[in-house]
A protein has these predicted regions:
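Positively charged n-region of N-terminal signal peptides that target proteins for export
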Residues: 1-4
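Glycoside hydrolase catalytic-domain context in secreted enzymes
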Residues: 18-750
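Bacterial N-terminal signal peptides
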Residues: 6-16
Length: 750
């Protein structure tokens, strides 16, 4: 009997030793395979193979384990194997990057099915999502759809930055939200703390993966040396050293999975750094989303300075992933930089992409164009194609030029047709073997980013886990703390702040007067449309204010006033009406509140020329512009008059350097807020938190110094000096004790 029992036990052990090392469970909408010492697999329709007792997905359904299906092999081995198996039609699909896709429900739309199936597209740009759970279910439906196609290549979903807050959002300790809320990139720079930026990357990447997103179209590390540029807000400011450190921290945070081999794991998100070689030095601040802003200029000869955040930051990480996996060139023509004299948009420039990025700096990651560079441009002011310097070519020819320049992927293009035409042009000029090798090289780079992030093993996400992860309380708190650290106090005359509220229900509780602000009708993003009609309203919710102070209806009742305004807003540098009246259409971009006449502008622009213009000079010398929100200055002046000797605290919501010399004499305290909740402002004003932010850029004394600075040179303006003798320069900020001097200022202040 004992012998029989022993034999039975031995058989059980033998079967266990010889049986599979994995087990399968049903997840919400997909199957999950967990295995001891092996990769976790998620799938819906692909057959499973068992090799050496481990499970593998037979993605191409050929009944054999291909190297690209073998999760035990290095990512580059797998990518090369799969790329070699793909047809040119399939590779053409990998080279596409979708237009913006809003996720309003879990189902895949018919246009999405078309570009996924017929065009073989696998890189999808996700914009708004209805909820984390909806995003998860949509992702799972997309992944199930593409798993059943061809080689089973998963979708690599991506996102532009999605963690910026609204002023009216409220933070409640212990409560969650739809996603963690952080200051703008410029606000993160104002913390002067790369550790905060890395923490943001770690948290945001975890939220992204919970939404089914594996690529971030960020960070924007353009060196913002031109103060009038509308995209200044998305950068880390104007200092090369700070920009470099923040770029490195951001990418490390996004790409690194803690304790994972080589840094890559299921919490990793590919970072697509932008914009090479910098969109910062736009002539006169006009943005290259439009024809009128297509030139980046270098009057100070500082081209190399703009590369540092890439070459010394994003390409030299502290973490195991080593470098950012993708780069996006900007729309601009880097005027006069190519030694050959060829002035074309960066995405079309062999010098910018191959000679510099790939050969000089050794970058072999993905290069993806900015969105819409191969499309036609209909008018100087039109928001459509951005084919700068190659306007005379066809759409297919532009695709060919981009590929010859060294680019791998075409942003905003859903149609493989022009890519296939470009392939035939390559065959015509260089032969079939060279064309195949060139396209296959791009396929390898593109596939690597999906293999490294584990998408081939499990691209699915649990909807319930997504809802629990995105915006969970500890993430919300970290974002809110970063907001508090991003606000910069630039003036505190007579220690007007903090305004300690006192205790509720006690006679010592202070009263605050918050004047209504006029919200003017202003153009939307990139000037595409006008916003809501102009109206008067309070800039902060009364209920929020009353958590700190009593609400004063009239200024004479108040102990102090709190005025919350926007920076001066004055257009994009081009006016169709000026052109209709016989001008060239080019006008100043003002950073001051009062009407501005450009008396110190260049007589001759540095760059110019377009097939749709019969002149070269884009100067606006002598022209005058007004701001949409001049009433903000009037409001500050009126409030100061009403308050008499009582303190007036002004909060300026800023996105770039602004001229505040008109406002400064009428404010006792000034706070600069870079995309933070009003609650953060109230916590600072009330003294609940001490301000610690520093200016990530200079605040200019006047528009003359703005006109006379060189677009490509950092720190070359004359900063404002206030009534207390403080200079509002880079790395300046106040706390309750006065001017901040600490380890951050010692490291970065010039």
């Amino acid at each position: 009997m004992r012998i029989r029992i022993a034999l039975t036990a031995a058989c059980v052990l033998l079967l266990a030793a010889c049986g599979p090392k994995w087990q399968e469970t049903e997840a919400d909408g997909f199957k999950l395979v967990n295995q001891k010492g092996g990769a976790t697999l998620g799938y819906t329709s692909a057959p499973l193979l068992t090799v050496d007792r481990y499970a593998f997905k037979d993605l191409n359904r050929n009944g054999a384990l291909d190297p690209y299906e073998d999760w035990r092999l290095p990512a580059d081995t797998r990518a090369k194997d799969l790329a070699a198996q793909l047809s040119i039609e399939e590779i053409a699909g990998l080279m596409l990057y979708s237009g913006h896709q809003a996720v309003r429900g879990p189902e895949i739309t018919d246009p999405q099915k078309k570009f996924l199936k017929e065009d073989n597209l696998r890189a999808v740009l996700v914009t708004t999502v209805e909820s984390p759970e909806t995003a998860a279910r949509w992702n799972n439906n997309v992944q199930a759809f593409v798993e059943a196609l061809g080689h089973g290549i998963p979708a690599n979903n991506s996102s532009d930055p999605r963690n910026e807050t609204a002023a009216t959002a409220e933070f409640n300790l212990g409560s969650g939200g739809k996603i963690s809320l952080w200051p703008t990139t410029l606000g993160l720079a104002a913390t002067f703390d790369p550790a905060i930026v890395e923490q943001f990357g770690q948290i945001a990447s975890e939220e992204y993966r919970a939404l089914g997103i594996a690529t971030a179209l960020s960070p924007q590390i353009d060196l913002a040396t031109e103060p009038r540029w509308s995209r200044f807000n998305g950068t880390f400011g104007e200092d090369p050293d700070l920009d470099t450190d923040m770029a490195r921290a951001y990418v490390d945070g996004f790409q690194t999975t803690p304790d994972a081999k080589d840094g890559w794991g299921l919490k990793s998100v590919n970072a697509m750094v932008k914009h090479w070689p910098s969109g910062g030095p736009e002539e006169a601040g006009r943005d290259a989303h439009f024809n009128y802003g297509k030139f980046a200029v270098y009057p100070g000869g500082a081209f190399e300075t703009h590369l540092k955040a890439f070459t010394e930051g994003a390409f030299k990480l502290n973490g195991g992933t080593k470098r950012a996996t993708a780069v996006m060139p900007y729309y601009t023509i880097s005027y006069g930089i190519d030694p050959s004299g060829d002035n074309v948009g960066n995405n079309f420039s062999k010098y910018i992409i191959t000679d510099l990025l790939r050969e000089k700096f050794g970058y072999d990651g993905v290069v993806c164009t900015d969105w819409g560079v191969t499309n036609d441009n209909r008018a100087i002011e039109a928001f459509d194609g951005k084919c700068w310097g190659v306007e005379g070519l066809s759409v297919a020819e532009r695709h060919y030029e981009v590929i010859k320049a060294g680019v791998d992927q075409l942003g905003g293009n859903n149609d493989k047709g022009p890519v296939l035409k470009a392939y035939q042009m390559y065959v015509r000029d260089f032969g079939e073997a060279a064309a195949r090798a060139r396209f296959e090289a791009s396929a390898v780079r593109l596939l690597l980013n999906s293999f490294r992030t584990g998408l081939f093993e499990n691209p699915y996400v649990e909807p319930a886990a997504s809802a629990a992860t995105v915006g969970k309380p500890e993430f919300m708190q970290a974002g809110y703390e970063a907001q508090l650290k991003s606000v910069v106090m630039v003036k505190n005359h007579g220690k007007a702040l903090p305004e300690i509220p006192g205790q509720a229900g006690n006679d010592g509780k202070k009263k605050v007067f918050v004047p209504e602000r006029y919200f003017p009708q202003t153009p939307g993003m990139f000037g595409l449309s006008m916003g809501a009609p102009g109206h008067w309203d309070y800039p902060v919710d009364k209920a929020l204010v009353e958590k700190y102070y009593d609400w004063a209806v009239e200024p004479e009742e108040a102990d102090f006033a709190l005025v919350i305004i926007e920076e001066p807003k004055a257009g994009s540098g081009y006016d169709v009406n000026d052109r209709k009246k016989g001008g060239n259409g080019y006008v100043p971009i003002s950073l001051q509140y009062r009407p501005y006449k450009a008396e110190y502008a260049r007589k001759e622009s540095i760059a110019g020329g377009d097939p749709k213009e019969d002149f070269m000079n884009r100067s606006y010398l002598g022209k005058t512009v007004t701001t949409y929100n001049e009433k903000d200055l009037d409001l500050v002046m009126l409030t100061k008059k009403q308050m008499g000797s009582k303190p007036v605290v002004v909060v300026v919501r800023a996105t770039r350097p602004v001229v505040l010399s008109e406002l400064e004499p009428y404010a006792d305290a000034v706070l600069i807020a870079f995309g933070v909740q009003n609650q953060a402002v109230m916590d600072l004003v009330s003294g609940a938190v001490e301000p610690s932010g520093l200016l990530p850029m200079q605040l200019p004394a006047d528009m003359r110094t703005v006109e006379e600075q060189k677009e490509d040179v950092p720190h070359d303006m004359r900063p404002l000096v206030d009534a207390d003798g403080n200079t509002w320069d880079f790395a300046y900020g106040l706390n309750w004790s006065g001017v901040i001097n600490d380890a951050r200022t010692a490291k970065y202040r010039k």
